[in-house]
Design a protein with these regions (language model features):
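Short acidic/polar hinge/loop motifs at secondary-structure boundaries
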Residues: 59-62, 180-207, 295
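Short, acidic, small-residue-rich periplasmic hinge/interaction motif at the N-terminus
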Residues: 26-33, 38-45, 73-77, 87-132, ...
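C-terminal beta-signal and adjacent terminal beta-strands/loops
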Residues: 494, 655-664, 688-747
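Extracytoplasmic beta-strand/coil segments of soluble accessory domains associated
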Residues: 140-181
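N-terminal periplasmic accessory domains that precede
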Residues: 88-94, 139-142, 161-164, 190-196, ...
Length: 747
C-alpha cells in the first residue's frame, strides 16, 4: 500500500518531466543582499507537482503549458503566487518576511506564552519570561501562571505537588525532557520537583493525543521541558532564593566553550528546609524538612557546516525528606508507635544522549537518535508502612525525517525501544517485574501553511506484558479565515499502571491495600487503554487597536480499560480493573488581551466532568473541582533609551469550585467529612526590579489571601488508629508565604 502511495505521488512528476522550469528563491541578509533560501516550497497551484529549493535556493520543476500559477512558500515568509508565461526564462524571486505567519502572542513585544496558528497540534509554548513570573523553584511550580495545568498538593504529609491536565492526573500525561520521557515509573510522585526551574529554557504543553514519535503511553497530553543549552546560556548564572518558611535555594550555572564546536555546562542546585512548621496546630508538620543536591553536566557538539549536532547529559540527584509529628525523632521513633513520622530518601542517576544530522545538500532530510538511561532508588516509610522502589530504565529512539514530492508532504519514521525493571517492597511483600517493548512508527504531515495542516501517525509495538498493539493518532488544523485556527484530534493511549509509585499518598493513611484481580499481567491487573478526542478553536482579534486572542477547547477521554483507584471505603484502598465506564470531559475558554503597551491580561474558565463506575456506583472523581476561574495580569515598565533597568509586576488569581470528598460515612461521626469541600481562592504576586542585563532582584508572595485548610489530616489526634488519613487535601495548608531572591549573570 505504501509503495502504491509513493507511485501515485511521483507519477505526475514523471509524466511532465519532458519540460522544466528553473530558478532561484532568495531572501535578504543583514546587509540587504540577496542570498539563496534553502528548503522553500515551490509547486504548481492545485497540483501535487512541486519541489524544494536546494542549499543555494535553486530549483528545477516539471512544466506543462496548462500550468500557469507557481506557488512559493516558506515558514515566516509571505506566500507568493507567480504567473509563468515564459518557461524558458529562469525565475528569480525574493520572499518577503511577514508578521501574518508569526505565532499568536499573548504579550505585545516578546511573547511569554504563545499558541501557533499554523501547527496541527494544540501546543502551548511557554518561554523563560513566563517562568520568571513566579519563583518556579522546580518544574512542579512552573505552572502557576498557566490555566491549562492544575496544581495541588497530593496529601498533607509529603508536600508533593500533583498536576492535572484535562481532568486527569500526571500518570496520564507524557512528561519529557527534551522529548525524552523522563517523569515516569518510580519518579512519577516526586519527579517534577527534581528538575530545577532555572534549568528550564521553555515548556511545550500539548493537549490531547500527542505524536506517535514520542511513544504510546500519553493519554491526556504531553509536557516537554527544553533545558538550557550550554552554547546559548550565560557563562555564569547565579540564582539565590529565600522564603519566610526558611526554605533556601541556590542555583549556579557555569558554561564554557571547548574549541570552536564543543560547549560544556555545569548546573548546580542545592535547596534546604530545616524548620518545623505547624500553622494549623494539629501536631503535624505542614511541610516536610528536606535537603536536595542536584547536579547536571551537559556537553554540546555543533558542526553546522557538516550538519551535525549532539548533546550528552549526566545528572545526579540526592533528595532526603522528613515529615510527620512535631516530636518525631527518626533515631528513636522510626517504625514505632512512639510518634508518627516519615522519611523519603531518593537517589537518582541519569545519562542521556541526542545525536542529530541534517544533510547540508538536502536540508529536508535528517536523522535523530535519542538514548537515555536512569537508575532510581527510593527508600521510604510512612508511620508503620514501608515502601521501597528500585527502577532501572532504558530508552532509545531513532527518527528519520524527509519529504514526499515537496515540503508540503513531510514524513517521520523510526524505531523505538524501552526497558524497565521494577523492584518494589510494600510492607512485607516484594513486587518485581520486567517490561520491554520494541516499536516502529510512521507519521505523515501535510502542510500548506495558510489553510490546512494534517498530521496522521501510527505506531506498532510489541510489549512483553501488554502484547502486540497499534496506536493511531490524528491532528488536523484548518484556518477558515484570517487569524483563526480550528483544530481536531483523536488518538489512542496504552500504559501499565504503577499502582504504588503513582499513589504514594496511600501510605500516609491507615487504609488496607487491596489488589482485586489476578488475571492481568501487571500485579494481577490489566493495562490501561483510553481514547482521547478533542476540538479547539483559536481566534485572534483587535479591540480598540490592541491585539488579543480567544480560545475554546473541548476534550473527551474515554477509558476502554482502567485501573480504578477506589478510595470510597475509608478503611481501604482498592485497585481493580474498570467494569463499566470511565471518562473525563474538559472544557476551557481562555482570553489573552493587551489593553495597553507592556500590560497583558489572561483570563480563563475551565469545566470538568470526570466520572468513573466504581464498585459502589458511578461517582465523580474525588478532589477534582468542576469549575475553575483563572486570571493573570502582568506589567513591565518601558525600557528607556540607553538604560537597562525596568520594573516587572505579575499577579495570578485562582478560584476553585467545590470538590467531592471520597466517602467517609463508614467512619465514626467525629471522623466524618462533608460530601464536598469549600471553594478556594488564592492570589500570588511578584515584583521584579531589573537593574541591568546582569542583575535583578525579585520579591513575591504565594497564597496572599491566606487561605488554609484547618484540618487537612483526618484522625491527626490518633495517627496509628483506624481513621488516620492525610489525603483529603483540597487547598493550601501552610497559609501565606513570602519570598525574595536575586539573579546574576555574566554573558
Amino acid at each position: 500500500m505504501k509503495i502504491l502511495y509513493y507511485i501515485i505521488l511521483l507519477l505526475p512528476s514523471i509524466i511532465y518531466s519532458q519540460e522544466k522550469i528553473s530558478g532561484m528563491i532568495m531572501e535578504a541578509n543583514e546587509k540587504n543582499e540577496p542570498i539563496g533560501l534553502a528548503g522553500a516550497n515551490v509547486y504548481w497551484l492545485d497540483t501535487e507537482i512541486g519541489t524544494v529549493t536546494d542549499i543555494d535556493g535553486g530549483f528545477n520543476l516539471s512544466y506543462d503549458p496548462k500550468f500557469k500559477k507557481l506557488v512559493i512558500s516558506y515558514v515566516g515568509f509571505k506566500t507568493d503566487t507567480l504567473t509563468v508565461s515564459n518557461p524558458n526564462q529562469p525565475i528569480r524571486h525574493w520572499l518577503r518576511p511577514t508578521d501574518n505567519l508569526d505565532e499568536v502572542t499573548v504579550t505585545t513585544r516578546k511573547p511569554s506564552t504563545a499558541r501557533s496558528y499554523l501547527k496541527a497540534q494544540n501546543i502551548i509554548n511557554v518561554n523563560s519570561d513566563e517562568l520568571l513570573k513566579a519563583a518556579c523553584c522546580n518544574l512542579s511550580e512552573s505552572f502557576e501562571t498557566n490555566p491549562s495545568i492544575d496544581v495541588n498538593f497530593a496529601d498533607a504529609i509529603s508536600g508533593t505537588r500533583q498536576i492535572k491536565m484535562l481532568g486527569l492526573t500526571s500518570p496520564y500525561i507524557l512528561i519529557a525532557t527534551e522529548n525524552i520521557p523522563s517523569i515516569r515509573g518510580a519518579s512519577q510522585a516526586y519527579g517534577l520537583s527534581f528538575i530545577p526551574g532555572t534549568w528550564v529554557e521553555s515548556i511545550q504543553i500539548t493537549k490531547g493525543a500527542g505524536s506517535v514519535v514520542n511513544g504510546y503511553e500519553s493519554i491526556a497530553g504531553q509536557i516537554n521541558a527544553e533545558l538550557l543549552k550550554p552554547s546559548k546560556d550565560a557563562k555564569l548564572f547565579v540564582n539565590l532564593y529565600g522564603a519566610t518558611n526558611e526554605r533556601l535555594e541556590l542555583n549556579t550555572h557555569l558554561n564554557t566553550s571547548v574549541g570552536s564546536k564543543w560547549h560544556s555546562g555545569l548546573y548546580l542546585h542545592g535547596s534546604t528546609l530545616n524548620q518545623k512548621h505547624d500553622v494549623n496546630h494539629d501536631n503535624f508538620m505542614d511541610m516536610p524538612m528536606y535537603d536536595q543536591i542536584n547536579v547536571l553536566n551537559r556537553w554540546q557538539y555543533t558542526d553546522t557546516e557538516n550538519g551535525f549536532v549532539s548533546f550528552l547529559s549526566l545528572k545526579f540527584l540526592n533528595d532526603t525528606k522528613q515529615t510527620g509529628e512535631l516530636n518525631f525523632n527518626p533515631d528513636t521513633d522510626k517504625l514505632t508507635t512512639n510518634a508518627w513520622g516519615s522519611e523519603i530518601d531518593t537517589k537518582r542517576f541519569e545519562i542521556s544522549g541526542k545525536f542529530g544530522y541534517v544533510n547540508p545538500n538536502i536540508p529536508w532530510q535528517s536523522l535523530g537518535i535519542q538514548t537515555a538511561y536512569s537508575s532510581h532508588e527510593q527508600n521510604s516509610y510512612f508511620g508503620l508502612n514501608i515502601y521501597d522502589i528500585t527502577h532501572h530504565s532504558l530508552y532509545a529512539n531513532a527518527i528519520y525525517n524527509s519529504i514526499i514530492s515537496d515540503s508540503r508532504h513531510k514524513i517521520k519514521t523510526g524505531l523505538s525501544y524501552t526497558y524497565d525493571y521494577y523492584d518494589e517492597f510494600v510492607n512485607t511483600l516484594d513486587f518485581k517485574r520486567n517490561e520491554n517493548s520494541v516499536g516502529a512508527f510512521f507519521e505523515y504531515s501535510y502542510d500548506n501553511l495558510e489553510l490546512l495542516n494534517l498530521t496522521a501517525g501510527v505506531r506498532v509495538d510489541h510489549h512483553n506484558l501488554l502484547g502486540n498493539f497499534i496506536t493511531p493518532r490524528l491532528h488536523v488544523r484548518y484556518s477558515p479565515w484570517r487569524k483563526s485556527a480550528f483544530r481536531a484530534s483523536f488518538g489512542r493511549g496504552k500504559r501499565s499502571a504503577n499502582i504504588f509509585a503513582e499513589n504514594q499518598q496511600l501510605f500516609a493513611t491507615s487504609r488496607a491495600i487491596n489488589i482485586i484481580g489476578s488475571s492481568g499481567s501487571i500485579y494481577g491487573l490489566h493495562p490501561e487503554i483510553a481514547w482521547n478526542y478533542g476540538m479547539s478553536y483559536l481566534q485572534g482579534f483587535n479591540l480598540f487597536g490592541r491585539k488579543g486572542d480567544i480560545t475554546f477547547d473541548f476534550y473527551k477521554t474515554d477509558f476502554v480499560d482502567q485501573v480504578v483507584v477506589d478510595w470510597e471505603n475509608p478503611q481501604e484502598i482498592n485497585f481493580y480493573n474498570l467494569e463499566g465506564k470511565s471518562f473525563a470531559n474538559s472544557f476551557q475558554t481562555e482570553v489573552n488581551y493587551n489593553p495597553f503597551e507592556y500590560f497583558d491580561l489572561r483570563m480563563a474558565y475551565k469545566y470538568y466532568d470526570v466520572k468513573t463506575d466504581y464498585n459502589s456506583g458511578r461517582r465523580a472523581r474525588p478532589l477534582t473541582p468542576k469549575h475553575r476561574f483563572f486570571a493573570n495580569a502582568s506589567y513591565k515598565t518601558e525600557l528607556r533609551e540607553g538604560k537597562q533597568g525596568r520594573w516587572k509586576f505579575d499577579a495570578t488569581f485562582n478560584w476553585l469550585g467545590e470538590q467531592r470528598f471520597a466517602s467517609t460515612q463508614a467512619n465514626p461521626v467525629s471522623y466524618q467529612l462533608p460530601d464536598y469541600s469549600p471553594t478556594v481562592a488564592t492570589l500570588n504576586a511578584q515584583i521584579t526590579k531589573v537593574f541591568s542585563s546582569k542583575f535583578e532582584i525579585y520579591l513575591g508572595g504565594e497564597n496572599m489571601t491566606n487561605v488554609k485548610q484547618n484540618n487537612p489530616i483526618l484522625g491527626a489526634d490518633d495517627p496509628f488508629g483506624a481513621n488516620f488519613d492525610s489525603t483529603f487535601v483540597f487547598g493550601p495548608i501552610f497559609g501565606s508565604m513570602y519570598y525574595a531572591g536575586l539573579r546574576f549573570r555574566i554573558e
